[in-house]
Amino acid sequence: MTRVFLDINVILDVLANREPFADEAEAVLRQVEARAIEGLVAAHTITTLHFLLAKYVGKAKVRKVLTDLLHVVRVVPVDEDRIRHALAMNWTDFEDAVQAACAEKAEAEYLVTRDKRGFKKSPVKIVTPAELLALVL
């Protein structure tokens, strides 16, 4: 099974229905839900999603949404080793470096994001949601 690491922007596109990106991101999550591919997210993605979405939909609803998401994806730890590795990568965007470091540790085949420029030096192959769908469908 193809193992993919999902950047937070892909999840946000679905949960916040951000057009014009939501449809492709949702199609990726449907593939994860159908177990056609294995979806991974960093632990801090869950806390960041809660922070970003709670003010728009309320804490109760965001907890339900995140609980549902956790039935679909596997959470990858963000530990000291990953933080040190991300710091050593010396990227401009530290959060992107942490995502890439987590994807690498989890042995993901692809890191799925709309921000390909932010991941130019990624140790894991970067694809957009559309590119991933073309590969797996």
What are these regions (language model features)?
Residues 17, 44-45, 65-90:
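Acidic catalytic patch
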Residues 1-41, 54-64, 121, 130-137:
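Short, well-structured N-terminal submotif of metal-dependent ribonuclease cores
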Residues 10, 45, 82, 99, ...:
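Alpha-helix capping/helix-boundary segments
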Residues 34-39, 74, 107-109:
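Short active-site oxyanion
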Residues 40, 76, 127:
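General small-molecule cofactor/ligand-binding pocket signal
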Residues 3, 72, 101-137:
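Acidic, PIN/NYN-like endoribonuclease modules and their adjacent C-terminal/linker elements
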